[in-house]
């Protein structure tokens, strides 16, 4: 049986409060749809931790700039429902709102063609939706993906805050593939006193090691093979650390050479402390190596945690 689908925020809030009145705990798995095994593993974890689970399916315009791939983001809602039906047992509902930004009334549409001083905007502002409030986690959002996608993390933090306020979950689950995002949500929850447990789940990978992503479907067969250079170079870096090679500049150069040698275009390679996301020069304790690279028109991210005590 396919899960119940809730389309508006008031009905979603009413459902959640009804569950709470019955003493049930609620899990939340935020997604943008086109579900793959990584998403489904989060749902399974949530079902193991809570009584009922809400899977949100909403492609968030607030985390895309007007030049990014909002319009081409893959979608298969009926397929998503079929996948969820196979594991829900009646304990999963889908929150699939049409729009979480338009609250009636519109702001003047922003067109950043030079008329607003080069201000960076998202598809929400560019579309003229009546929304002006954004959540920012100032320090953690500045590096990595925040450099090349300057509206991304404020859009993520804002939509997750909206979902927390609407669904009112006890637990929310996020994949560690989006490592910076996971740490940002953790910090936001701590700083704003949300009474929600944030669970990070290990990266789900294809059999050949490619990190699962909804965007993988847009890779050609050749691009997909070349994209394996990301996960393979990360594994090589981890093996090098185990052999005592701890200079971060050398490790980053090795990864860059592997990706570029496979015709990838590197956005960044960073080696940072797992907790603070501050860069390190020598690996002496727990770090994460984060990579973003383009293959064709598809931007992929991946990372690997390295836990050492040297």
Curated annotation (Swiss-Prot):
GO molecular function: ATP binding; pantoate-beta-alanine ligase activity; protein homodimerization activity
EC class of the enzyme, as a word: ligase
Chain sites annotated for binding beta-alanine: 63
GO cellular component, one term: cytosol
Protein's UniProt keywords contain Nucleotide-binding: yes
Family, similarity comment: Belongs to the pantothenate synthetase family.
Assembly information from the UniProt record: Homodimer.
Protein name stated in the entry: Pantoate--beta-alanine ligase
Species in which this protein is naturally found: Arabidopsis thaliana (Mouse-ear cress)
């Amino acid at each position: 049986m396919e899960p119940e689908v809730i389309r508006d925020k008031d009905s979603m809030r009413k459902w959640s409060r009804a569950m709470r009145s019955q003493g049930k705990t609620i899990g939340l798995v935020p997604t943008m749809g086109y579900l793959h095994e990584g998403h489904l593993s989060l749902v399974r974890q949530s079902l193991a931790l809570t009584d009922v689970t809400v899977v949100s399916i909403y492609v968030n315009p607030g985390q895309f700039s007007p030049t990014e791939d909002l319009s081409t983001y893959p979608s298969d809602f009926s397929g998503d429902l079929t996948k969820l039906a196979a594991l829900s047992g009646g304990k999963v509902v889908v929150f699939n709102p049409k729009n979480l930004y338009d609250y009636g009334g519109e702001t003047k549409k922003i067109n950043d063609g030079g008329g607003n001083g080069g201000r960076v905007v998202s598809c929400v502002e560019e579309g003229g939706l009546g929304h002006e409030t954004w959540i920012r986690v100032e320090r953690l959002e500045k590096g990595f993906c925040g450099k090349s996608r300057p509206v991304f993390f404020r859009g993520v933090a804002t939509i997750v805050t909206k979902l927390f306020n609407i669904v009112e979950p006890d637990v929310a689950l996020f994949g560690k593939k989006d490592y910076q995002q996971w740490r940002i949500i953790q910090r936001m929850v701590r700083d704003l006193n949300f009474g929600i447990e944030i669970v990070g789940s290990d990266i789900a990978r294809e059999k050949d090691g490619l990190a699962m992503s909804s965007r993988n479907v847009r890779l050609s067969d050749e691009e997909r093979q070349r994209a394996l250079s990301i996960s393979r170079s990360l594994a090589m870096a981890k093996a090098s650390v185990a052999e005592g090679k701890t200079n971060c500049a050398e490790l980053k150069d090795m990864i860059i050479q592997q990706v570029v040698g496979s015709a990838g275009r590197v956005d960044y390679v960073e080696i940072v402390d797992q907790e603070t996301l501050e860069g390190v020069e020598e690996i002496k304790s727990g770090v994460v190596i984060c990579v973003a690279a383009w293959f064709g028109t598809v931007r992929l991210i991946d990372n690997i945690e390295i836990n050492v005590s040297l």
